[in-house]
């Protein structure tokens, strides 16, 4: 994958750090276990949770770290206005502007819920010229459902 760190550089740094550890150098005799890896954000995940009354959008990197959260309530829509299309469009535009600021060009969309705001969010992302790689729908669908009531006989 293009967004992962080059393994060769990391292994060289790891060997350098272990040499310092063996010689009891600058690191106060503690083993070096955690190293921050740099990666470029080329692909990000957009989680859309749409209920009947609100739409929540969160942007994460490929490791699952949340970069930005938006909802219709955070865009100053309160009460019954949160379920409108305009509110979910405004939240999506805020996410898209953050993506352009961070130079994120490709998105993977993951949908949760049956609300109508998710359709508007996807439409807004397409309008703003970000490339959508995949759309995954993760709903809990009942395949047979609960047992129905006994039929009434007259």
From Swiss-Prot:
Q: Which family does it belong to?
A: Belongs to the universal ribosomal protein uS11 family.
**The name this protein goes by in its record:** Small ribosomal subunit protein uS11c
Q: Does the keyword Amino-acid biosynthesis apply?
A: no
The record's keywords, sorted A to Z, are: Plastid, Ribonucleoprotein, Ribosomal protein, RNA-binding, rRNA-binding
Annotated GO CC locations: plastid; ribonucleoprotein complex; ribosome
Write the signal peptide boundaries: none
Superkingdom, taxonomy of origin: Eukaryota
Q: How does it assemble?
A: Part of the 30S ribosomal subunit.
Q: Name one GO molecular function term.
A: rRNA binding
One Pfam family named in its UniProt record: Ribosomal_S11
Main location, first listed in the record: plastid
User: Where in or outside the cell?
Assistant: Plastid
Q: Would you kindly state one Gene Ontology biological process term found in this protein's UniProt entry?
A: translation
Q: Does the keyword rRNA-binding apply?
A: yes
């Amino acid at each position: 994958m293009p967004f992962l760190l080059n393994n060769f550089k990391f292994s060289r740094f790891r060997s350098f750090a272990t040499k310092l550890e063996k010689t009891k150098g600058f690191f106060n005799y503690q083993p070096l276990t955690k190293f921050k890896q740099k990666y470029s954000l080329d692909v990000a995940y957009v989680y859309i949770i749409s209920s009947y009354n609100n739409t929540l959008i969160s942007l994460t990197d490929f490791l699952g770290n949340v970069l930005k959260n938006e909802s219709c309530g955070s865009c100053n829509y309160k009460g019954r206005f949160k379920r409108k299309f305009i509110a979910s469009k405004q939240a999506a535009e805020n996410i898209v502007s953050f993506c352009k600021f961070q130079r994120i060009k490709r998105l993977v969309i993951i949908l949760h819920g049956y609300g109508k705001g998710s359709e508007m969010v996807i439409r807004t992302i397409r309008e703003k010229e970000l490339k959508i790689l995949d759309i995954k729908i993760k709903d809990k669908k009942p395949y047979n459902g609960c047992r129905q009531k006994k039929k009434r006989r007259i």
